[in-house]
Amino acid sequence: LCPNVAILDPTLVTGLPRHITIGTGMDALTHAIESVVNPSGNPITVGLGLQAVRMIRDSLPRVVADGSDLCARQDMLVASTLGGLALGPGLGMAHCYAHTIGMLLGVHHGTGCGIALPAAMRFNREHASARLAEVARAMGVETAGMSGVEAADAAADAVEALMKAIGHPTRISEIVTQERILENFEQIVAGTMSDERTGDQLRLEHLP
């Protein structure tokens, strides 16, 4: 889909329910971070993605706390658009997982992305440490003195901290029963691995 116009009017989304605000916000953050670490990324997509990360870091907690905050809503709309513009190189494993559990378990797409994002970042940390270090700094982490892998881990930790601060689940078991997860486990793995976006992963050759 390639729209001709994007209407970024914060007054249109002030009534968005809190859980939708949280889920769509995490989807936007996932777009941004996956664009930054994608091996096919370029200076334009990386720059757009990092700016989106910075804006979401600052604005998402504000819109969750006060949905009528027009400045924060506006910043989230702009950040989401920047993340969309950065998607040219492709997405990543968090989206593969979200597509699958959305279909099999009915999990909101953005929520599925958010749950998978920190794990996907850690999975790729050795092969994307430099880009993930940039994400860490965009999330407000002071990375001076850290190794690349330490900075990558700090980026994932910062994302998890944001999720907890806004009331977003960090584990699928928080919103789906263990029984349903186990019943669908093989399909979840197969669906995630067969998603066309899995090819964007840096460590695909190391997957079991």
Which role does the model predict for each range below?
Residues 15-18, 86, 201:
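A generic structural signal for short coil/turn motifs at secondary-structure boundaries
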Residues 1-41, 131-138:
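A glycine/threonine-rich phosphate-anchoring loop and its flanking beta-alpha core
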Residues 132, 136-208:
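C-terminal charged capping/lid subdomain of soluble metabolic enzymes
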Residues 7, 25, 32, 93, ...:
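Alpha-helical architecture
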Residues 22-25, 73, 113, 185:
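Short runs of predominantly hydrophobic/aromatic residues within well-ordered alpha helices
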Residues 35-158:
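Active-site segments that bind and position negatively charged phosphate/pyrophosphate groups
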